[in-house]
């Protein structure tokens, strides 16, 4: 897009946790950055009756999963808001055989750009060192990286857009909401240009909309989309 003279940018994301007819426009961090990781712990297979003749990768993999929480809790800034989730863990096929390999994967979410690289470094260091203590080694999946930066809204864009929107639709359309721990590719635009992303409420119990995102019952109160159009116009006309 370098051939286009872009001043700033704006986007909306529908949000199940806000009522239809409300929109959230706030400066600063709004959606989380994402570190993703997939870790293979490589050992040496053998019979379950003689663990001393094998190098059981299940043991260090289990320790790593527990130690990652401790590492982040004790080495990250206590004022940083972040989460860590292990979402996959698997190893072995049968009860009496030590496998060659164990695997786990997961994600960490955070709201300041420097935090992502530090979280990633801590994950890699913890995995490598704990595996080494148990005579094993680790291999990381290619997607073990900072996958998304946090969405951080520009104050000037937010204030100007919100002012125009309230002139158009009234102050009652502005709603309050905290941080959203999901991640969003719009961060790539915000890394290049000043801009903002707003949350557009779509929940309406009378229509049955408001189930969580990616839930099979997720639905939208389409009447809320008109407010979204007004917000986009407000950004363009401010």
Protein language model regions, located:
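Histidine/acidic-residue-rich, glycine-tolerant segments that coordinate divalent metal ions
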Residues: 1-88, 92-99, 184
